[in-house]
């Protein structure tokens, strides 16, 4: 989705992507290239973003800004219909666990940061900063028209998924 956001941001600003060299790199490779001074610009995230700023980088675009421009991006979990029909109890358990995790994140940020730091081998400061840049949407709010919606009222996520899918097809991804 970062590639999608980058190209949408360039289009919004009237910049032709063919006027530059765009590289598709993994996060750690971006950070290393940035540290070496090999890149003029990059779209990446914590824990490397803060380090880039410390080395003279300036944040001029974020996924939050792009969401306000009409390009939200999402992290979602999906299952195949066949799996959901065969194992509805597992799907229900997963959704409940996911919702409990989101609630824990929202209600216990300090403890969540410790867990993330340990799990991802990050400094606590990096994990805390990373969390601040991540919006966790409570499950009840996900069932509103802005997000997933309901079976009777399909939410904005469906539109976003269609736009992103068309983009990925156009990029042969």
Language-model features and meaning:
Residues 29-120, 125:
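Pocket-lining segment of extracytoplasmic ligand-binding domains
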Residues 3-21, 53-55:
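Ligand-binding cleft/hinge of the Venus flytrap
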Residues 21, 39-40, 155:
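Residue-level marker of alpha-helix boundaries and capping positions
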Residues 21-23, 60-61:
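General small-molecule cofactor/ligand-binding pocket signal
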Residues 85-173:
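Secondary-structure end/capping motifs
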Residues 2, 27-30:
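Conserved donor sugar-nucleotide recognition element shared by glycan-biosynthetic enzymes
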